[in-house]
Amino acid sequence: MSLSTLKPLLEVQGLTRYFGGLLAVDQVSFAVQDQEIFGLIGPNGAGKTTLFNLITGLIPPSQGSLIYQNNSITQLKPYQIAEKGIARTFQNLRLFGNLSALENVVIARHIHNQANLISGVLGLPKAVKIEQENYQKARQLLDIFGLAERAEQKARNFAYGDQRRLEIARALALEPKLLLLDEPAAGMNPSEKKELSDLIRKIREQFQLTVILIEHHVPLVMGLCDRIAVLDFGKLIALGEPEMVRNNPAVIEAYLGDE
């Protein structure tokens, strides 16, 4: 995908985060283009998930700023950032295991449409219509992810790879502009990883999404991403197209040499 005609959606500017005396993220700067698939790789403990937590407002930066659609989101709370169109998945699955796949996605629709929480209690006609739309859109998302026939099954009974797909479907129910995926291929077999890669491309096109993903499976990242940033000990050591990153001596020494 050509990036020459795209505009930056997210700008990370000198982002820094200390935990006590530990410098977890060290003056990291990069821009992510609209509808780009952007990879974030590096050794364990490099600061990747911390960076996601900073972008989504789960923790505040010690220094630096975050610009999303030309507006600062640096001091916003997580729910405010979500309202602006940023959604994420987590390294550790956070599904509601006792609820069905459909219910998991519908809950996210409720969060997206806060009016439903209020008017639904009152039984207003508008609320009934909104709820019907919530279920319709949830079923559409499950269909996209190949889970429609199991919509009524409890999430805890899904295989791990299917739970990963369900979590992404739930994130999409928030109708984000920017989707952050934290190790989406973890625990998947090679066939499932290939399906996931194809699926990410599909939802990028279908929903005009921008995607940032953390992933340890290097072939998936290299084959999927438009550009890749590499972190090591909290520092950005490389940024560029996959082939450039693959051949970067600093990246080979810090990370790819272990593959």
Predicted ranges, named:
Residues S2-E259:
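Glycine-rich phosphate-binding loops of nucleotide-dependent enzymes
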